[in-house]
Curated annotation (Swiss-Prot):
Domain of life of the native organism: Bacteria
Role summary: Incises the DNA at the 3' side of a lesion during nucleotide excision repair. Incises the DNA farther away from the lesion than UvrC. Not able to incise the 5' site of a lesion. In vitro, the incision activity of Cho is UvrA and UvrB dependent. When a lesion remains because UvrC is not able to induce the 3' incision, Cho incises the DNA. Then UvrC makes the 5' incision. The combined action of Cho and UvrC broadens the substrate range of nucleotide excision repair.
Matching Gene3D superfamilies: GIY-YIG endonuclease
Class of this enzyme: hydrolase
Lineage per the UniProt record: Bacteria, Pseudomonadati, Pseudomonadota, Gammaproteobacteria, Enterobacterales
CDD domains, per database record: GIY-YIG_UvrC_Cho
Secretion signal span: none
Organism: Escherichia coli (strain K12)
Gene Ontology CC terms, in alphabetical order: excinuclease repair complex
Enzyme Commission number(s): 3.1.25.-
Gene Ontology MF term list: DNA endonuclease activity
UniProt domain GIY-YIG: residue ranges: 33-108
Name this protein carries in UniProt: Excinuclease cho
Description of what induces expression: Repressed by LexA, induced by DNA damage.
Length: 295
């Protein structure tokens, strides 16, 4: 007698479908195994209950049975929809945009942060600057992206503690001219405030410590297209100043999306910085005169 072995994936899917609320099971059969975004809808036609993303929509949706919150969300859901993308980048970008626009009940809120700030190094001085006042995509010597001024100063203080930098010279506390700071007496400051260390050495150590937090300036003159491919789909992500303007199916359609970004997009920067600079994707500069150059 030949015994047929069932794959773990098929066993998981069969069990998951059986455990799913009965009123949602009809939507499960058509779930694609492709990358993209999926939405759980409740009674409202305008506000989804939950928006998620995955490189395999079917597998991810079927796994939504792990916590009491997920079970509560499924009970309130009335239907499931999805949007396929060419890959993980497109799924991440589309998910972030839809969550901001539609504010689903069960998602962590992604709102435009009007207090978004960074540390800016000017010669030997560090200032806290805000994205609403400075173009973070172009401004030089920016380090870290913080939700507010307090978080930025806490990060600077942590670096000062690790590197024995002077709070006074960093503007974290008042400093009397010509006198050592209190932390110097405790050997928590290397003494740039009292001549034990030169200001140049202090500034160099500060810059070296901040380097890991550097905000990369937008390296192109204008918009670019990042090509993302799937066996069943190709997308060109149109990006300018780290802001995702949208996706098109061909470069000829790119000009319909090009516009001047209204501000710095923190989520776009986090998602796009690594893939754009990795060299793993085809990048095409989008010239206003349509002279497109691939790199």
């Amino acid at each position: 007698m030949v015994r047929r072995l069932t794959s773990p994936r098929l066993e998981f899917e069969a069990a998951a479908i059986y455990e799913y609320p009965e009123h949602l099971r009809s939507f499960l059969n058509d779930l694609p195994t492709r990358p993209g975004v999926y939405l759980f809808h409740g009674e409202s036609d305008t506000m989804p209950l939950y928006i998620g993303k995955s490189v395999n929509i079917r597998s991810r949706v079927l796994s939504h049975l792990r916590t009491p919150d997920e079970a509560a969300m499924l009970r309130q859901s009335r239907r499931i929809s999805w949007i396929c993308t060419a890959g993980e980048i497109g799924a991440l970008l589309l998910e972030a945009r839809l969550i901001k626009e539609q504010q689903p009940l069960f998602n962590k809120r992604l709102r435009r942060n009007r207090q978004l700030c960074a540390l800016q190094l000017n010669e030997k001085r560090v200032d806290v600057v805000y994205a609403k006042e400075v173009d973070f995509s172009r401004a030089p010597n920016l380090f870290g992206l913080f939700a507010n001024r307090r978080a930025a100063l806490q990060a600077l203080q942590t670096i000062a503690d690790e590197q024995k930098l002077c709070y006074g010279l960093l503007g974290l506390e008042p400093l009397s001219r010509g006198r050592a700071c209190f932390r110097s007496a405790l050997k928590r400051c290397a003494g740039a405030c009292c001549g034990k260390e030169s200001h140049e050495e202090h500034a160099l150590r500060l810059r070296q410590s901040l380097e890991r937090l550097r905000v990369v300036c937008w390296p192109w003159q204008g918009a670019v297209a990042l090509k993302e491919q799937h066996p069943e789909m190709t997308q060109y992500h149109i990006i300018q100043n780290w802001l995702w303007l949208g996706a098109v199916n061909s470069l000829e359609e790119a000009t319909t999306l090009i516009r001047t970004p209204a501000g710095f997009d923190h989520d776009g920067y986090k998602i796009l910085c690594k893939p754009l600079l990795s060299g793993n994707y085809e990048i095409t500069e989008l010239d206003p005169a349509n002279d497109q150059r691939a790199s």
